[in-house]
Amino acid sequence: MELTVTQTTPDQLIERSNRLGADPRTTNYAGGNTSAKGEAIDPVTSQPTTLMWVKGSGGDLGTLTESGLAVLRLDRMRALVDVYPGVEREDEMVAAFDHCLFGTGGAAPSIDTAMHGLVDADHVDHLHPDSGIAIATSADGEVLTSTIFGDRVVWVPWRRPGFQLGLDIAEIKRANPQAIGCILGGHGITAWGDTSDECEANSLDIIRTAEAYITEHGKADPFGAVVDGNEPLPEAERRARAAALAPVIRGLASTDLRMVGHFTDSDVVLDFVAREKLQPLAALGTSCPDHFLRTKVSPMVLDLPGTASAEEMVTRLRELHAEYRTAYAAYYERNASPDSPAMRGADPAIVLVPGVGMFSFGKDKQTARVAGEFYVNAINVMRGAEALSTYAPIDESEKFRIEYWALEEAKLARLPKPKPLATKVALVTGSASGIGKAIATRLAAEGACVVIADLGLDRAQAAAAEIGGADVAVGVQVDVSDEDAVQSMVDAAALAFGGLDIVVNNAGMSLSKPLLETTVEDWDRQHDVMAKGSFLVSRAAAKVLIEQALGGDIVYISSKNSVFAGPNNIAYSATKADQAHQVRLLAAELGEHGIKVNGINPDGVVQGSGIFAGGWGASRA
């Protein structure tokens, strides 16, 4: 094995990783890992030393940078073979990798480090492509591997990731010098090469060959026929139904731990939830460790047709949720040992609704979105396996060993402490500028997902992008005096993040005129925006908060003018007094649902404000 002496080695590795990670057909978010071996000068001895650069624990191939690489001395890493205590204690080897690190900084080595270091090849890729996992989870995967690839790709029976799997693959590489890689049963693929380009080409060869074989030889309808009544609802009806269901489902999914939601109604999802094999395949659960660590072992599936009413769906979802929790607790009890970590929660991470789509949940928007993406990967895997054979994921006990793995628990324990408003969803009206934008910015900084609602869509979207992008903030257009527009705004919040927790009534305007110059039109316009608008927003939001059953907060940005009188602003001050009394009324009414209603009475805020339409801001500055 010839090794190169230059910075080119890690540079090429990063470029290869980014290309592979950019294609969802190749690997999923934060899944898989890549490596390269080469030489560098030891700064202590000034002698060349053989190193391995490998993607570190928790990194994502698509966005990998040099800081995300773990760098190990290859001789020390391979010397661990001599002290390996056996498969029953292989978890101890992860800590041993730290004693093989070269230099300072860099990422922590992952559980797959041994696979890369022990295989006798300069470059190694371990990936989770849909087509490769489809072969890996087929009941006759070993036969299919031989049929599709001949002796170029070798079958490796399922083994949990770790040091022993690295030894197994290294031996397979030695015994099969003609092979370019292997299919890992129930898991994914590994490929290798003498150069970075050759390794990447071999990875893509395995993936594309599997894709082509599935397309050419697979059954046309591997999920069976479309069930009558489960066809996708028309788009507008489907989105409205999803918005109505999302808060209910989010509340159920947050029984143990509050979650943020994500909704997906892609063609892949809608086709799967419409088919006759939906229930039996979903019950089998996912197989690839990266999949079920994000999605849990199986989803919750509504067993009603898409044509059922919203009320029927809600009633049945509540029943199914109770059943799911009982089943998950039983799964934990069946498989747990005295040393197992405590159960992390019995609620579903994925909920499938025929005719509507998929709801996914996580500790933040990104986690919820990625869980949904992983389940789409799982659907593709099931389709490929069923097209060629029968989908056969790894055993339940093996899934549990990974889901409640001590190493996985340790990784979770190392996560930073969540911010105060993590898992909360906030909606702020009039938040593209002024007080509203400042509030939205602070809420996001404290960990909340934020809906920026404003009369101008472009301004709302620009503010959302400035605050943090789609996994943190979304911009929506709303005229708070329009009942339908307000409902659309609340629906958008439900579709974006699953529901609401904090609602800030901030939208406003000011017409500063003496009594005798104030027209009926002025009065009506002022009250439409602030008094009526606050009422409409609070009413629509309260419905969501009550359905979620998670409590919540409604905050009114009123004004000192609601209390103190002054000349030349009767319309504005009267609406502020209206808002102040709405606070008192709603606090009394909504408290039984755990919903707190409060008001803030600030003085004039001019900087960055867009509410002053009549020159009042300039006169008060």
What feature does the model see in each segment?
Residues 543, 588-589:
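Alpha-helical segment proximal to the catalytic Tyr-Lys
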Residues 514-515, 522-527:
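Substrate-binding pocket helix/loop in short-chain dehydrogenase/reductase
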Residues 559:
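Residue(s) in the substrate-gating loop at a strand-loop-helix junction
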Residues 424-451:
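Canonical Rossmann dinucleotide-binding motif of NAD(H)/NADP(H)-dependent dehydrogenases/reductases
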Residues 1-426, 438:
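Glycine-rich flexible loops
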Residues 538, 575:
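Active-site helix of classical SDR
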Residues 516, 564-570, 592:
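Active-site loop immediately N-terminal to the catalytic Tyr-X3-Lys motif
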